Amino acid sequence: MTRLGLVVAEFNRSVTERMEAAAREAAADADAAITDTVHVPGAYDSPLAADRLARRDDIDAVAVVGAIVTGDTDHDHVIASATADTLTDVSLERDTPVTFGVSGPGMSGAEARERVEKGAAAVESAVSLTQEL
């Protein structure tokens, strides 16, 4: 059984709570266990939580979910890029799969609500990588 850590960004909570539910359902379908869940303020805050989970012996992989909605500036692009880069660093430094189930950037709130399946996809990828590696 794959043991997962789950990081959930709270910003845009109406979307991310549905992403979390999709992630939990995907874990159950894959016969994986979510060992621990860490809620963080926003996607940008997720790398530290992912790193702490990836250090643990009782976690095989970490799935991160969040939603980055566009605003009046390019801030969403900056946040998404920095988050993706840093989560990749965590995965490589810890030799642990850290999957990116963060929707955005460049999407509206309505588009974010249509993409809650990224929560399930993050878990499915984490399980797949754990089994493959």
UniProtKB/Swiss-Prot annotation:
Keywords: Riboflavin biosynthesis, Transferase. InterPro entries: LS, LS/RS, LS/RS_sf. (2S)-2-hydroxy-3-oxobutyl phosphate binds at residues 72-73, 115. It catalyses: (2S)-2-hydroxy-3-oxobutyl phosphate + 5-amino-6-(D-ribitylamino)uracil = 6,7-dimethyl-8-(1-D-ribityl)lumazine + phosphate + 2 H2O + H(+). SUPFAM superfamilies: Lumazine synthase. Pathway: Cofactor biosynthesis; riboflavin biosynthesis; riboflavin from 2-hydroxy-3-oxobutyl phosphate and 5-amino-6-(D-ribitylamino)uracil: step 1/2. One of its GO terms (biological process) is riboflavin biosynthetic process. Its EC number is 2.5.1.78. One of its GO terms (molecular function) is 6,7-dimethyl-8-ribityllumazine synthase activity. The active site is at 75 (proton donor). Coiled coil: none annotated. 5-amino-6-(D-ribitylamino)uracil binds at residues 11, 43-45, 67-69, 100. GO terms for cellular component: cytoplasm; riboflavin synthase complex. Catalyzes the formation of 6,7-dimethyl-8-ribityllumazine by condensation of 5-amino-6-(D-ribitylamino)uracil with 3,4-dihydroxy-2-butanone 4-phosphate. This is the penultimate step in the biosynthesis of riboflavin. Belongs to the DMRL synthase family. This is 6,7-dimethyl-8-ribityllumazine synthase.
